[in-house]
Amino acid sequence: MGVKRVIVFDTTLRDGEQTPGVNFNSRDKLEIAYQLAKLGVDVIEAGFPAASNGDFEAVKNIADYVKGVTIAAMGRAVKEDIDRASSALKNAEKSRLHVFIATSDIHLQYKLKMTRDEVLKKAVEMVKYARGKFDEIEFSAEDASRTDWDFLVKVFSEVIDAGAHIINVPDTVGYAMPREYGELIRYIRNNVPNIDGVTISAHCHNDLGLAVANSLSAIENGATQVEVTVNGIGERAGNAAMEEVIMALNTRKDYFGLVHGINTKEIYNTSKLVSELTGIKLQPNKAIVGANAFRHQSGIHQHGVINNRLTYEIMRPEDIGVVPDTFALGKLSGRNAFELKVRQLGYNLSPGEISEAFRKFKDLADRKKTIVEEDIRFVVEETIEEFRGFREGEAWA
């Protein structure tokens, strides 16, 4: 039996656009879609065609021009949404409808005003209606993590019989715990009688900061598709961050034993593009793509990394397309890191000069919140002037 592969479904352009303050225009969406295809995602959820004319045109443009990847469009379980999605995806190389209806009792009572039987009937009818209009049909049970498990199994079983190829299990409000969500995925796999050959998808929100953990738990328990967004953008607290899920799978291949189609060297470029087009800056300590993700300030850590990067790095910045800027020099930095930085700047100092320059650096670092490259050059040039009687002005060869 071959190595199992996880399908990467990117919803940056649909769920990601639901981030408060984010509004992609059609050109933005197309640019991101091209980059997602270059990144190697399997499915791009391009938008919600029935939501607006602008979203319809954006989805249509992506379907018309972006090839080599499945293009998905979302719609409610109503004929008008399904028809609109079908029209938008007409020229897609491979099309997918992502149709949804809520299944939790709280949604049925307060939002849909429907009974369980009515929801089940509507779900089955709309999947049957969509059959033949798309290459694939994905059915989502909205608020699955708060739905009665046996009812969820019944819904999934009947929509599969109706023609669904993928069943999605959304933790819509980020309520589930990792073990609990994994157990739900396993329960579905073990109790839906016609599940063989059907893709089980995980879609997790980050309201409790657990979207990535829940996604990985789902994969561990049998989910074969994971739904993610670049930089974790999305409704409220966001979605599972693509870069974190993928690099967890990469870094712990020994644990998960799975492969995917992502070209990880495009992760940083993709993250940067989405950050620029959304206007959402990444926090410096953001995992994988934050400015500090591969930087070390402690002298002990810096010394370890100089000797062998594996001492304090579990992945290489080059693996995600980042040019290393390994050391953040500051008051906690040690002499080894300082000396390496001085050499990288092109200076060739004697041991005595290094000692004096390092003393000046530590004194400055105690007084200055942020040390930049020009600060290093200043203390080195000042030291050279004191020892040699002149400022070098340029790096020594």
Swiss-Prot record:
Belongs to the alpha-IPM synthase/homocitrate synthase family. LeuA type 1 subfamily. It comes from the Bacteria. NCBIfam families: PRK00915.1-3. Its EC number is 2.3.3.13. It catalyses: 3-methyl-2-oxobutanoate + acetyl-CoA + H2O = (2S)-2-isopropylmalate + CoA + H(+). Residues 6-268 form the Pyruvate carboxyltransferase domain. CDD domains: DRE_TIM_IPMS. Mn(2+) binds at residues 15, 203, 205, 239. This is 2-isopropylmalate synthase 1. InterPro entries: 2-IPM_HCS-like, AIPM/Hcit_synth_CS, Aldolase_TIM, LeuA/HCS_post-cat, PYR_CT. The keyword Zinc does not apply. Catalyzes the condensation of the acetyl group of acetyl-CoA with 3-methyl-2-oxobutanoate (2-ketoisovalerate) to form 3-carboxy-3-hydroxy-4-methylpentanoate (2-isopropylmalate). Its cofactor is Mn(2+). Homodimer. GO terms for biological process: L-leucine biosynthetic process.
